[in-house]
């Protein structure tokens, strides 16, 4: 109904039910955003600070870099390996240890290479430095069907955030609706920099 403000709880309940086959999600482990780009921007606004390190791969989704630049962060990248664009897991791990990045973005599957890391590989990277926040961008996850959501425990892996959206997988790019999944304390913190009604009722209903 467009005469009242949008209500997010029904959508959160749907998302919780959607993943019941793998594990139970709580409403407070889910954030709702006006598209995945808004989620990415909110994460940088919450956790990115001047001169801190932002680690990602090259090439990858282009919106990460301007968000990091707006926060004055220093970007470090690792290039994919060879003609098959293998993930540089050893170099990436070494740079986590050496630079202790504040934010780590992994597009999985990667845009534009299609490179995929397993859930365990991502969890292993997150365990290297517990004070580094790893953001897993899963916008294209439905094309390979291997989401980290199927196995993660946000109480244990509390330095991992997962971003998903309905733009690519459901053909709803024009409605702008994105989600973050993570430890409830992280989600609550990110919600403080977003408006209470950023996502419109049409997008929620869809």
Region roles according to the model:
Residues 1-35, 42:
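N-terminal small-domain helix-loop-helix segment of the aminotransferase-like
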Residues 52, 73, 129-133, 137, ...:
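A short helix->loop->beta-strand "cap" motif at the edges of active sites that frequently abuts
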Residues 31, 35-41, 136-145, 149-153:
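Glycine/small-residue-rich loop that forms an oxyanion/phosphate-binding "nest" at active or ligand-binding sites
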Residues 159-206:
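PLP-dependent aminotransferase class I/II
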Residues 83-144:
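Active-site phosphate-binding strand-loop segment of PLP-dependent enzymes
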């Amino acid at each position: 109904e467009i005469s009242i403000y949008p209500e997010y709880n029904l959508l959160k309940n749907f998302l919780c039910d959607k993943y019941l086959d793998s594990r139970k999600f709580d409403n407070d482990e889910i954030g709702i955003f006006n598209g995945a780009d808004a989620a990415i921007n909110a994460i940088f606004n919450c956790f990115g600070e001047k001169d801190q390190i932002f680690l990602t791969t090259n090439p990858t989704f282009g919106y990460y870099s301007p968000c990091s630049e707006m926060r004055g962060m220093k970007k470090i990248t690792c290039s994919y390996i060879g003609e098959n664009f293998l993930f540089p897991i050893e170099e990436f791990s070494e740079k986590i240890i050496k630079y202790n990045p504040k934010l780590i973005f992994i597009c999985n599957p990667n845009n534009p290479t299609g490179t995929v890391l397993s859930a365990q590989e991502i969890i292993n990277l997150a365990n290297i430095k517990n004070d580094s926040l790893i953001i897993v961008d899963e916008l294209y996850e439905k094309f390979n069907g291997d989401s980290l959501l199927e196995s993660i425990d946000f109480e244990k892996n509390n330095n991992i955030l997962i971003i998903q959206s309905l733009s690519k997988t459901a053909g709803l790019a024009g409605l702008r609706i994105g989600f973050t999944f993570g430890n409830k304390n992280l989600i609550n913190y990110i919600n403080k920099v977003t408006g209470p009604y950023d996502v419109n009722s049409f997008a929620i209903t869809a």
